[in-house]
Amino acid sequence: MANAYKQAGVDIEAGYEAVSRMKKHVQTTMRKEVLGGLGGFGGMFDLSKFALEEPVLVSGTDGVGTKLMLAFMADKHDTIGIDAVAMCVNDIVVQGAEPLFFLDYIACGKAEPSKIENIVKGISEGCRQAGCALIGGETAEMPGMYSTEEYDLAGFTVGIVDKKKIVTGEKIEAGHVLIGLASSGIHSNGYSLVRKVLLEDGELSLDRIYGRLELPLGEELLKPTKIYVKPILELLKNHEVYGMAHITGGGFIENIPRMLPEGIGAEIELGSWKIQPIFSLLQEVGKLEEKEMFNIFNMGIGMVVAVKEEDAKDIVRLLEEQGETARIIGRTVKGAGVTFNGGKAL
């Protein structure tokens, strides 16, 4: 039967080898609350140790999108898993939740044990950065659905927060200060446009350094998404945070309003933070308007937090002590949506 299955394109032995290879990476993510080991039908996590008055579970799921195609082109697979974790855990930490565990889903045309190991190595690194356990996953070999070199990657996370400490944004008022945490680069959104502008139309090479980039283009584009969990959880222990936004697809213009109550807008001060050279290269090569850039990309800011003005400097200092680059980038105002430099729309 194994030979028949192999002739159909599914290599069971390769699947077993991939699982064996990934175990050492997964083990590095374990928390004391994890029950059992790899290989069970489901992952188990003991919640009894959390002394919360009204515990609330917060879940999130996401993928890496077409950034995967850059990984295929560069044949580099050991960091794309960090992106998968980041996209999920950053989404739930903005609600005040501590990520507890993570599960991954890898679908591929052909199970290559070394490639699968590298993907899971990255996922495990992301979980360590976020402090969550990788308690399960699925690797599906699907010949005919994907080419032998292709795979898709998605993740799922669950976190916990005391109900009274959920960050909703509903108490944000005009005059609150917006603090931005620097991104590592493009993160994991907008890569369909990135490929069209830089690789298809611009015919740039992944191996060359362009303009003010410090790395070859391929390395720049594959920089992993920053994981903000630990600095944000430390911030929440020490200060009141009124709202947070993870700047993903839709950029500033779509994501900042997601944390704001009705009747409140955001005014952003352009020039108050450093926009990385990769965004300038994209805008120049693609002849993209500034509004389009801010409506697609994070433009150098991966997370925005809303705080009281009197707390802002202390919070910037705390975030900097946690290793983040943090800047005051604007404030909340009466109105709606996002404007720039004195209330102007881009």
From Swiss-Prot:
One Pfam family cited in the UniProt record for this chain: AIRS
One biological process term in Gene Ontology: 'de novo' IMP biosynthetic process
Enzyme Commission number(s) of this protein: 6.3.3.1
Catalytic class of the enzyme: ligase
Keyword hit for Ligase: yes
GO molecular function: ATP binding; phosphoribosylamine-glycine ligase activity; phosphoribosylformylglycinamidine cyclo-ligase activity
UniProt KW keywords: ATP-binding, Cytoplasm, Ligase, Nucleotide-binding, Purine biosynthesis
Known catalytic reactions: 2-formamido-N(1)-(5-O-phospho-beta-D-ribosyl)acetamidine + ATP = 5-amino-1-(5-phospho-beta-D-ribosyl)imidazole + ADP + phosphate + H(+)
NCBIfam families recorded: purM
Functional pathway: Purine metabolism; IMP biosynthesis via de novo pathway; 5-amino-1-(5-phospho-D-ribosyl)imidazole from N(2)-formyl-N(1)-(5-phospho-D-ribosyl)glycinamide: step 2/2
Entries under InterPro entries matching the protein: PurM-like_C_dom, PurM-like_C_sf, PurM-like_N, PurM-like_N_sf, PurM_cligase
Protein name: Phosphoribosylformylglycinamidine cyclo-ligase
GO cellular component: cytosol
Main localization (coarse): cytoplasm
UniProt-annotated location(s): Cytoplasm
Species assigned in the record: Bacillus thuringiensis subsp. konkukian (strain 97-27)
